[in-house]
């Protein structure tokens, strides 16, 4: 059995979860990138891995119907958000309906994994994470919860949303899919090595990591028994962030990402609204971080209607990328 080409693989893990014989496992290459391998002794050529692969199965995307600049009406929520707090508003709406929320979190070893919560642990979803995240058992867990009737929201990278859609094969009415405007992802080992370098240099143990500070990009590490970080490096001085923003350390698939386009594979797309006020005056008396929210499907429209009263929002029309309002380098 042949999986997709390695340079196109996003390391989502759908193939491993779909295999009934546990014949697929992940292997890390010499550069720290993880890719699936098939144990030929266990494989029975059933083809379920290929049917669950979003690279091998084309998905229809949707042009955003509406675009908004959004920030949470809750000032305390905004203080703990690295953007405008749109994701937090979405999570709280699902929790209110006894639903389950999925997103990327740091575990106790500062490794990024996708987790699901049905309580106020959603605080763990906050904080930017500029690294690849492992899905683990997320595919199977979400499938079972959807079948049990729970409302589920999944917020992840476009390739992870596409992977979940392909794995499920059914458009569950109780599933809200939200993708993040992505810049590309380095493997976890690069971040691990960067953290360990500073831990050894400073003789400190890092318990908390941050990539944002006052709406600027900083690499910060903090111990649990201290107030101030023992490392705080601006992105122009930090090798991890510098290589991230210069697009030097991503998975191969990121450099030819088929989801980096106007057509979105999710119900809703969120990200940072860079450049707000540069084209037209922003007269709302608010100077904090702002989220961009793109509504892509009828389900997205319906869900966003449920949370509008918890946001301050400004309607803008979806438009092509403008280099003057972008903080990210273009691949064009």
Descriptions of predicted regions:
Residues 178-194:
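Short, flexible loop segments at boundaries between secondary-structure elements
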Residues 8, 14-31, 35-37, 47-64, ...:
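Iron-sulfur cluster-binding cysteine motifs and their immediate structural context
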Residues 41-148, 317:
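Flanking helices and flexible, charged tails adjoining ferredoxin-like Fe-S electron-transfer domains
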Residues 170-180:
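A short alpha->loop->secondary-structure connector
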Residues 202-297, 301, 311:
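A conserved active-site cap/scaffold subdomain adjacent to cofactor or substrate pockets
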Residues 127-172, 187:
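Intrinsically disordered, low-complexity linker/loop segments enriched in Gly/Pro
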Residues 315-324:
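Conserved small/polar residues in nucleotide/adenosyl-binding loops
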Residues 327-332:
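Hydrophobic alpha-helical segments, chiefly the membrane-spanning helices
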């Amino acid at each position: 059995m042949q999986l997709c080409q390695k340079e196109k693989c996003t390391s989502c893990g759908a193939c491993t979860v779909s295999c009934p014989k546990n014949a697929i496992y992940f292997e890390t290459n010499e550069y720290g990138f993880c890719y699936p391998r098939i144990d030929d002794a266990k494989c029975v050529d059933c083809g379920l891995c290929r049917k669950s692969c979003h690279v091998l199965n084309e998905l229809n995307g949707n042009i955003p119907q509406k675009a908004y600049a959004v920030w949470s009406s809750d000032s305390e929520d905004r203080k703990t958000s690295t953007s405008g707090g749109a994701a937090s508003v979405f999570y709280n709406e699902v929790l209110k309906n006894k639903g389950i929320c999925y997103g990327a979190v740091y575990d106790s070893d500062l490794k990024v994994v996708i987790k699901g919560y049905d309580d106020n642990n959603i605080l763990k979803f906050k904080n930017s994470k500029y690294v690849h995240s492992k899905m683990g058992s997320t595919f199977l867990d979400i499938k079972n919860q959807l079948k049990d009737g729970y409302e589920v929201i999944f917020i992840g990278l476009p390739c992870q949303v596409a992977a979940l859609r392909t794995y499920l094969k059914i458009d569950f009415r109780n599933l809200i899919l939200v993708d993040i405007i992505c810049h590309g992802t380095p493997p976890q080992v690069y971040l691990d090595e960067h953290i360990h370098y500073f831990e050894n240099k400073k003789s400190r143990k890092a318990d908390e990591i941050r990539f944002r500070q006052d709406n600027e990009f900083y690499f910060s590490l903090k111990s649990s028994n201290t107030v101030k970080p023992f490392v705080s490096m601006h992105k122009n001085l930090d090798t991890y962030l510098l290589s991230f923003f210069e697009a030097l350390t991503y998975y191969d698939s990121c450099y030819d990402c088929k989801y980096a386009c106007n057509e979105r594979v999710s119900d809703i797309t969120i990200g940072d609204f860079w450049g707000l006020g540069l084209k037209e005056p922003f007269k709302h008396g608010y100077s904090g971080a702002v989220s961009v929210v793109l509504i892509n499907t009828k389900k997205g429209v319906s869900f966003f209607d449920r949370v509008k009263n918890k946001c301050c929002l400004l309607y803008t029309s979806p438009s092509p990328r403008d280099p003057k309002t972008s903080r990210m380098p273009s691949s064009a």
